[in-house]
């Protein structure tokens, strides 16, 4: 069994850790962006969140939806749906001994696709921008899963 120092010498794992940190930081940014838009537009989802703006009917007017808040929230949800599988499959893939350049290509394509997807979602850019970014990132994760299943797992 490999110890932590061996793992830290694994260039593919370290590349994965770097790119995983980037997409996780981006996902954390989306939480902050959602909160920013909720606060600046005074749009809340829960009654207790708008209690500082008054009570009763006065507070109820802040319980509403806003297109900008919903757009950021949907982009964040899309991150959750795509980054979590990338983290799990990417970790297993990085530990399976892939070629460094192939692994880095997978990681870079995924990170680039997710960043571009967020830009396309929040700007908003016309389709097929967002769709292409989504399918590129999804395809990268599928490619890693396929390579992992083909080369290292016994089915």
Swiss-Prot record:
The chain crosses the membrane at residues 10-33, 63-96, 100-123, 129-148. The keyword Glycosyltransferase does not apply. The modification N6-acetyllysine is found at residues 42, 55, 60. Belongs to the MAPEG family. Keywords: Acetylation, Endoplasmic reticulum, Membrane, Mitochondrion, Mitochondrion outer membrane, Transferase, Transmembrane, Transmembrane helix. It catalyses: RX + glutathione = an S-substituted glutathione + a halide anion + H(+). It is an enzyme of class 2 (transferase). Residues 34-62, 124-128 are cytoplasmic. One of its GO terms (cellular component) is membrane. GO terms for biological process: cellular response to lipid hydroperoxide; glutathione transport. This is Microsomal glutathione S-transferase 1. It is a multi-pass membrane protein. GO terms for molecular function: glutathione peroxidase activity; glutathione transferase activity. It comes from Sus scrofa. The gene is MGST1. Residues 3-9, 97-99, 149-155 are lumenal. Its EC number is 2.5.1.18. Glutathione binds at residues 38, 73-74, 76, 81, 121. It is found in: Endoplasmic reticulum membrane; Mitochondrion outer membrane. Conjugation of reduced glutathione to a wide number of exogenous and endogenous hydrophobic electrophiles. The lineage of its organism: Eukaryota, Metazoa, Chordata, Craniata, Vertebrata. Pfam families: MAPEG. The keyword Amino-acid biosynthesis does not apply. InterPro entries: MAPEG-like_dom_sf (IPR023352), Membr-assoc_MAPEG (IPR001129), MGST1-like (IPR040162). Homotrimer; The trimer binds only one molecule of glutathione.
